[in-house]
């Protein structure tokens, strides 16, 4: 890492067989507002030498050692045979994704639920074609250990995105300590 450079936040995307739309929408949102590296089975792309985020989508991972890793569990989620995760990893999942919830619980990592119900940690209290209101319904800690208190943040949308992609991007920004950027960026 370059001296003085911010460490790359790694986002590992698991599950979601046959659903490429969710990841492409998430990529679009992140790419507009920060620098990313995309790492997949057959591809590697990086916007710069030291990107803000590395999105890793590889099947059959057996071990993740990246510090402060974010594990995004998409549906449908098939429980991996064996995946060792760092203790400080954070799982992002829909509250309806019961397979992922059980797997995250067994792995012993922190979970943040994303969805449209009152039981979700991060939700949208409203959404239209050009705006949404993000609602952090309970306090969480970002990857640096800072507490993020419950808050509602108005978001500006450049186009219509599915709610899960918006929530994933917002969770990634929030966990990386960039929750304030959500008020200024265009999704």
Annotated model-derived regions:
Residues 1-91, 99-110:
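Phosphate-binding loop of NTP-binding sites
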Residues 60-66, 115, 140-142:
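Short, Lys/Arg-enriched charge-dense amphipathic segments
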Residues 75-77, 96-97, 116-119:
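Short, acidic/turn-prone active-site loops that include or flank metal/cofactor-
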Residues 92-95, 111, 124, 169:
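Residue-level signal for inorganic ion chemistry
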Residues 107-119:
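Short, solvent-exposed linear motifs at loop/edge-of-secondary-structure regions
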Residues 116-187:
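Adenine nucleotide phosphate-binding catalytic loops in nucleotide-utilizing enzymes
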């Amino acid at each position: 890492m370059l001296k003085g450079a911010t460490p790359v936040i790694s986002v590992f995307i698991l599950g979601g067989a046959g659903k490429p739309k969710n990841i492409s929408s998430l990529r679009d949102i992140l790419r507009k507002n920060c620098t990313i590296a995309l790492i997949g089975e057959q591809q590697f792309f990086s916007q710069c030498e030291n990107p803000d985020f590395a999105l890793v989508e590889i099947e059959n991972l057996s071990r993740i050692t990246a510090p402060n890793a974010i594990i995004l569990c998409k549906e449908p989620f098939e429980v991996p045979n064996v995946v060792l995760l760092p203790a400080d990893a954070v799982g992002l999942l829909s509250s309806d994704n019961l397979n992922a919830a059980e797997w995250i619980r067994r792995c012993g990592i922190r979970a943040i639920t994303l969805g449209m119900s009152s039981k979700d940690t991060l939700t949208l209290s409203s959404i239209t074609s050009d705006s949404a209101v993000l609602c952090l319904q309970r306090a969480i800690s970002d990857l640096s250990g800072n507490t993020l208190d419950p808050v509602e943040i108005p978001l500006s949308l450049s186009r219509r995105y599915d709610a899960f992609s918006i929530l994933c991007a917002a969770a990634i920004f929030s966990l990386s300590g960039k929750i304030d950027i959500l008020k200024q960026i265009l999704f």
